[in-house]
């Protein structure tokens, strides 16, 4: 399913004709350029590889520069892939823009969540605090028991404990496209999308729409 790569600009709000305020995230989608078309015969699957944005020439490695030059496109800030479904065809060097979503109502947005560093179980996993008084000392925000006794004699994998939070790939599904601004290459998406301002996001038609 083909999508687009954009950059999160921030949040604002727009008003309907009835005066209802709608919170929206603004995603800037510069032209997505096709750098490679992968086929079942040569690569084992059908997909297109795209890039977007710009990158200083002295920041592009020689192999990457050769790859972009072969495709006849300007070097971008990264490379992404989208699997192709039967019947979809794209040419190397072709450009994709926000008009791809003119007929799309709902989208899934993928990004890298904001990093929160090392966090305890209350913030990280929404645990409840223990008693603030009633004889409790130094265990107000502690997780409590993390297992049993000699049997099984270990902590099970996946146990929710304190640790690094955020800075991971997150997808928010079924977000509504409120407006497509082709003139300024903007998508206005209802609600919040993952990541910090300036972060890359992948916008695809919703799989559950």
Swiss-Prot record:
Transmembrane stretches, start-end: none
InterPro entries: Ribosomal_uL3, Ribosomal_uL3_bac/org-type, Ribosomal_uL3_CS, Transl_B-barrel_sf
GO cellular component entries: cytosolic large ribosomal subunit
Alphabetical UniProt keywords: Methylation, Ribonucleoprotein, Ribosomal protein, RNA-binding, rRNA-binding
Gene Ontology biological process terms in this record: translation
Post-translational modification: Methylated by PrmB.
Residue numbers carrying N5-methylglutamine: 150
GO molecular function: rRNA binding; structural constituent of ribosome
Annotated family: Belongs to the universal ribosomal protein uL3 family.
UniProt function note: One of the primary rRNA binding proteins, it binds directly near the 3'-end of the 23S rRNA, where it nucleates assembly of the 50S subunit.
Subunit structure: Part of the 50S ribosomal subunit. Forms a cluster with proteins L14 and L19.
HAMAP family xrefs: Ribosomal_uL3_B
Protein name according to UniProt: Large ribosomal subunit protein uL3
UniProt source species: Photobacterium profundum (strain SS9)
Gene: rplC
């Amino acid at each position: 399913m083909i999508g687009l790569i954009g950059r999160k600009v921030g949040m604002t709000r727009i008003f309907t004709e009835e005066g209802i305020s709608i919170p929206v995230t603004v995603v800037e989608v510069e032209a997505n350029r096709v750098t490679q078309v992968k086929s079942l015969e040569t690569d084992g699957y059908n997909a297109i590889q795209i890039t977007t944005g710009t990158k200083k020439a002295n920041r592009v490695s020689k192999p990457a520069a050769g790859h972009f030059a072969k495709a006849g496109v300007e070097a971008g800030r990264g490379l992404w892939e989208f699997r192709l479904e039967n019947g979809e065809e794209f040419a190397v060097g072709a450009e994709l823009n926000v008009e791809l979503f003119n007929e799309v109502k709902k989208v899934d947005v993928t990004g890298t969540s904001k990093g929160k560093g090392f966090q305890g179980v209350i913030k990280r996993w929404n645990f409840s605090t223990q008693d603030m008084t009633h004889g409790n000392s130094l265990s107000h925000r502690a997780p409590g028991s993390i297992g049993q006794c000699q049997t099984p004699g270990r902590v099970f994998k996946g146990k929710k404990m304190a640790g690094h939070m955020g800075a991971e790939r997150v997808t928010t599904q079924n977000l509504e496209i409120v407006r497509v601004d082709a003139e300024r290459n903007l998508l206005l998406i209802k609600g919040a999308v993952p990541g910090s301002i300036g972060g890359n996001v992948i916008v695809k038609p919703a799989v559950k729409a």
